Structure formats: C-alpha cells, structure tokens
C-alpha cells in the first residue's frame, strides 16, 4: 500500500510540474503602408518577474535561447529590413555570467513586408522563444502567429503552421537587431529619501 501511495504521489507531482503555464500572452496586428507593403506587429505581455529574450545573440552565442521569428509562405512576400524590437535592454545576469539581451513586462517586434502576391489573406509566423525568472527557465517553446491582411479571414494559427510543416516547407528566419544596438539597462545609484 505504501509503494502505491509513493508512486501515486510521484505521478501527481510530475503532472503538476508538467502543467506550468506560459507567463506570456502574444498578440498580432497589421499596419498597412500601401497596397503592397505592411508592417507586421507582434506584442508579448510578460508576467512580472519573467523575461523573454531578444533576437540578438549573447556573447559567443551563449546564454539564453534568443527569440526567433520564422515566416512561412515566403514565395508570396519578402521580408524588408530587420525585425525591429522595442523594449529590449542589456543587463548583466549572474547565472549566465554575461550581459543578456531581454524584455521585461512587454515586448514589441515590427517586421516590414512587401507582397509578391496581392491576393494573399494572411501571413503565418512561428515565434520560438524562452522565458526565465530569477530561479528557473521554461523550455523554449513555439507560438503560432497569424497576421491577417484580410480581417475577414478565419484561420487557426496552429493548424496553418502544422500544414506548412506537413508540406515540408522550410520557413525563413527574420533577421533581428545587432546586440551592439541594444542599450545597457541604467542602474540608479541614487537613494530614495
């Protein structure tokens, strides 16, 4: 009976740790520049105490997993310029032993595109990212994103991304900013009175 109790307790503990919720909430929007040019905007709200990492790699490609944006169906459009970031900062993090490029609370990414096919209704993207707090990191995970060029289109992001993978399509990875363009977080040495 005791062995059964221990086994059952271990199984329940395993289930509870496997159900850690993602501390991010991702949304997309589209800004139309012209009939053939758009800015695809991705925003992530990040729970307090957690960080999402920049697309910029750390020193010698070490440190946390950098965020990636992988675009599918790229025969219908071109990526123009880099996938810009707003809210990123560099900060020395003891556990990594180096400056880490990260977001806290909120992240914003903007990718400009030019259409090759004016009839496409949406752009499918998979964001791949990792989140950490001061004590743990969750395994890197994908987030399926759809940018609706036609607001009336009704698609399920995971189904679209899976269909591209099932068809054997290789996505194109967006280029992020250079690490040297990210400012170091200012640390105040003034005391509050």
Residue map of PLM features:
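N-terminal hydrophobic targeting signals that begin at the initiator methionine
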Residues: 1-2, 20
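Sec-dependent N-terminal signal peptides
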Residues: 3-14
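Extracellular/lumen-exposed scaffold segments
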Residues: 18-193
């Amino acid at each position: 009976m005791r062995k059964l109790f221990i086994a059952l307790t271990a199984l329940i503990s395993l289930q509870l740790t496997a159900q850690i919720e993602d501390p991010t909430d991702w949304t997309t929007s589209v800004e139309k520049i012209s009939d053939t040019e758009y800015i695809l905007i991705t925003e992530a709200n990040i729970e307090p105490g957690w960080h999402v990492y920049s697309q910029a790699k750390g020193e010698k490609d070490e440190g946390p997993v950098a965020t990636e944006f992988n675009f599918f169906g790229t025969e219908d459009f071109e990526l123009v310029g880099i996938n810009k970031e707003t809210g990123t900062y560099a900060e020395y993090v003891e556990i990594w032993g180096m400056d880490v490029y990260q977001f806290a609370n909120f992240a914003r990414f903007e990718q400009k595109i030019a259409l090759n096919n004016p009839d496409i209704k949406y752009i499918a993207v998979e964001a791949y990212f990792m989140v950490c707090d001061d004590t743990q990191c969750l395994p890197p995970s994908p987030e399926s994103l759809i940018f609706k060029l036609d607001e009336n289109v009704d698609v399920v992001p995971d189904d679209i991304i899976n269909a591209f993978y099932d068809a054997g399509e290789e996505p194109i990875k967006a280029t992020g900013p250079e690490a040297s363009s990210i400012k170091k977080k200012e640390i105040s040495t003034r005391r509050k009175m």
